[in-house]
């Protein structure tokens, strides 16, 4: 069986923990992760001035698809950049059409709203993004730290990044693998 594949879309202003933790956890689980720079392959300055080097440009990574999951990190500016991107819209629409998993954290779910993805789903976001996400009646809101409704998986913020990442692993490769990855991380239960 071929290993599962993940596309993490990295935009300027993305939240560092919400990018790096899911990438790390998915790679520990044997998922082939591509970090794709929205604006190209150049290093990306994140919300707290950490710089991350993408594996590929989004344009190049798109050619290597499809992916089992598309991941959207949060960060206000990062989410805004994802929301304004026609390329992100195209990738998300394609992922939704082929019934692939879409995972977004913190302010990242606002890009789902902007691109009309997963309407009717139950979602969660960072508390500061709730009002924007609930503008209209496109989603129902959950206060859960991680919420999965069908093929839409959302989470609340930096402090839920491990839970979010482990849920992606569980969905893609199973709870047993997620538990094996979790054990050496020494997370609080």
Swiss-Prot record:
Modified residues (Phosphotyrosine): 67
Protein family per UniProt: Belongs to the peptidase C56 family.
GO CC, one annotated term: endoplasmic reticulum
Uppermost EC category: hydrolase
Cross-linked residues, Glycyl lysine isopeptide (Lys-Gly) (interchain with G-Cter in SUMO): 130
Disulfide bond sites: none
Keywords: Acetylation, Autophagy, Cell membrane, Chaperone, Copper, Cytoplasm, Endoplasmic reticulum, Fertilization, Hydrolase, Inflammatory response, Isopeptide bond, Lipoprotein, Membrane, Mitochondrion, Nucleus, Oxidation, Palmitate, Phosphoprotein, Protease, RNA-binding, Stress response, Tumor suppressor, Ubl conjugation, Zymogen
Cofactor detail note: Deglycase activity does not require glutathione as a cofactor, however, glycated glutathione constitutes a PARK7 substrate.
Active site: 106 (nucleophile), 126
Keyword Repressor: no
Lipid attachment points (S-palmitoyl cysteine): 46, 53, 106
Job of this protein: Multifunctional protein with controversial molecular function which plays an important role in cell protection against oxidative stress and cell death acting as oxidative stress sensor and redox-sensitive chaperone and protease. It is involved in neuroprotective mechanisms like the stabilization of NFE2L2 and PINK1 proteins, male fertility as a positive regulator of androgen signaling pathway as well as cell growth and transformation through, for instance, the modulation of NF-kappa-B signaling pathway.
Organism encoding this protein: Bos taurus (Bovine)
Enzyme Commission number, as recorded: 3.1.2.-, 3.5.1.-, 3.5.1.124
Signal peptide: none
Subcellular location per the Swiss-Prot or TrEMBL entry: Cell membrane; Cytoplasm; Nucleus; Membrane raft
Name of this chain's protein: Parkinson disease protein 7 homolog
Membrane topology, record value: Lipid-anchor
Keyword Endoplasmic reticulum: yes
Residues modified to N6-acetyllysine: 148
Gene (UniProt): PARK7
Residues bearing PTM N6-succinyllysine: 182
Modification comment: Sumoylated on Lys-130 by PIAS2 or PIAS4; which is essential for cell-growth promoting activity and transforming activity.
Modified residues (Cysteine sulfinic acid (-SO2H)): 106
Cleavage, annotated site positions: 149-150
GO molecular function: copper ion binding; cupric ion binding; cuprous ion binding; cytokine binding; glyoxalase (glycolic acid-forming) activity; kinase binding; L-dopa decarboxylase activator activity; mercury ion binding
Example of a GO biological process term: lactate biosynthetic process
